[in-house]
A protein has these predicted regions:
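Rossmann-like AdoMet
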Residues: 1-91, 95-138, 148-153
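A short SAM/SAH-binding and catalytic strip from SAM-dependent methyltransferases
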Residues: 154-166
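Adenine-nucleotide cofactor-binding loop residues
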Residues: 141
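Short acidic active-site motifs
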Residues: 144-145
Length: 166
């Protein structure tokens, strides 16, 4: 059964980013490949026709390249940090349906995905937390969520999806 996403909702922003990562994976697989985004496209019931139409423009393809480079650089930095802090907390602020933490998992780190409650509800349905992973519903402006992060082995924070919409 597919997960239905309504137009003109906060959850629609999740679809736009998943679509962008899927297109990056298809157009620039040597730079960035997101198997989770490819799989999620099949799990989401949404009218992608408008996004498909825009995908053919040169400007949109450049945007996809920019996303691919940003995601690749971000994953590089997280993996590099984990080399010297293998049991660190990997904290994805405004995670949406992003699986960067999972793609950087070294088998010892702890992964924390933080977002609004309605977003975490979608994430739990489509990307349930795995081993050593926790999806936390919160408002990033209320720092009480810090109490849920075990940073005893260090911590690396990133917010790839937050600043696009702020």
């Amino acid at each position: 059964m597919k997960y239905h996403i309504e137009k003109n909702t906060v959850q629609e922003t999740l679809v736009i980013l998943v679509y962008g990562r899927k297109m990056c994976s298809e157009l620039f697989p040597n730079i960035f490949r997101d198997e989770t985004a490819i799989r999620l496209m099949d799990a989401i019931a949404y009218d992608f026709s408008e996004l498909f139409k825009k995908s053919d423009s040169t400007m949109q393809r450049f945007d996809f390249l920019e996303v691919a480079m940003r995601q690749s650089d971000l994953a590089f930095e997280v993996r590099d940090y984990l080399k010297s802090h293998p049991t660190a907390a990997v904290v994805n602020l405004g995670c949406g349906l992003d699986a960067t933490g999972r793609s950087c998992d070294n088998g010892s780190c702890k992964i924390y995905n933080l977002d609004f409650a309605d977003v975490i509800a979608v994430r739990n349905a489509l990307l349930p937390a795995g081993e050593r992973e926790e999806n936390i519903a919160c408002d990033l402006n209320d720092t009480a969520w810090f109490d849920n992060i075990d940073a005893s082995g260090g911590a690396v924070f990133f917010a790839a999806g937050v600043f696009l919409f702020s």
